[in-house]
Amino acid sequence: MKKFSIVKHARIFFSITAVVLIVGIVSMFARGFNLGIDFTGGSILDIKFDQPVTVAQVRTVLSDHQLGSSVIQLGSSDQQVESSQSVLIRTGLISDSQRVDVMNDLSNRLGHNEVLRVENVGATVGGDLVKSAVGAVVLSWVLMIIYITIRFELRFALAAIVALIIDVMVTLTWFSVLHLEIDSSFVAALLTVVGYSVNGTIVVFDRIRENLHTHRRNESMGDLVDASIWQTMTRSVYTTLTTLFAVVAIFLFGGETIHNFSFAMLVGFCSGFYTSTFLAGSMWLFFRKKLKR
């Protein structure tokens, strides 16, 4: 039985990718990103009350201090609750005197509370973190281009980097469309996705290179790429599934603090499988035709 030709249907896979990327780009320009205080600067107050309080009660107090737009999170897990003793408040950057006034007002109106954690991130620090995050991702791409060029050749490297850029863009698309918060852990997730995705792509490229040594003149390069992809398909599927099992478990049971981190990896790993399986080989063929020796 003849196997499905991935190369011959490359336009379909690239069209799907293009639609997703267009949606993402529109969302990025229209809605932007929900940047956490790691990037924008701000304050985090982790408070525990003696009695359960609601979001509305806390927001009413904060509104009197011009902090009504603050993000208020109840509890310490993903479980949605109407009231809780544990409250996490994310605001714009406030001074120590403002914080003391807010805490005193919360105590007077909602009961005694204990401050478990206070974090302040200045706007300058947040801006520096954005530059560092972008620099880290770009540096990883540059190093991979150098490594793959040495290990294989430039055409393989270019195809791999385009696949990685797509993976990063797809992950950013989901976070923009769903308006999920992007913090420093998101950068770590992106770098993890880049490393995982390039690993899957390298496996396919390594098989293509091996098959080139036994390539028959009457066999088209498209058939060779298809054969290489299918020869590595079982490995790719098993590796992706076993990795996703762990990531899904973290996503479901890991708690609020790493929820977005695990979601970024979940999206990125799925995209990595898609690009390495359905796009990378066809992109190598494209660069092979354009950059003939």
UniProtKB/Swiss-Prot annotation:
Domain of life: Bacteria
InterPro entries, per database record: SecD/SecF_arch_bac, SecD/SecF_bac, SecD/SecF_CS, SecD_SecF_C, SecD_SecF_C_bact, SecF_bac
Cellular-component GO terms for this entry: plasma membrane
Pfam families: Sec_GG (PF07549), SecD_SecF_C (PF02355)
A GO molecular-function annotation: protein-transporting ATPase activity
Spans through the membrane: 10-30, 130-150, 158-178, 185-205, 244-264, 267-287
Protein's membrane topology: Multi-pass membrane protein
Location relative to the cell: Cell membrane
Single GO BP term: protein transport by the Sec complex
Keyword list, A-Z: Cell membrane, Membrane, Protein transport, Translocation, Transmembrane, Transmembrane helix, Transport
Disulfide bonds: none
Keyword RNA-binding: no
Function: Part of the Sec protein translocase complex. Interacts with the SecYEG preprotein conducting channel. SecDF uses the proton motive force (PMF) to complete protein translocation after the ATP-dependent function of SecA.
UniProt family annotation: Belongs to the SecD/SecF family. SecF subfamily.
Subunit structure: Forms a complex with SecD. Part of the essential Sec protein translocation apparatus which comprises SecA, SecYEG and auxiliary proteins SecDF. Other proteins may also be involved.
The name this protein goes by in its record: Protein translocase subunit SecF
Native species: Acidaminococcus fermentans (strain ATCC 25085 / DSM 20731 / CCUG 9996 / CIP 106432 / VR4)
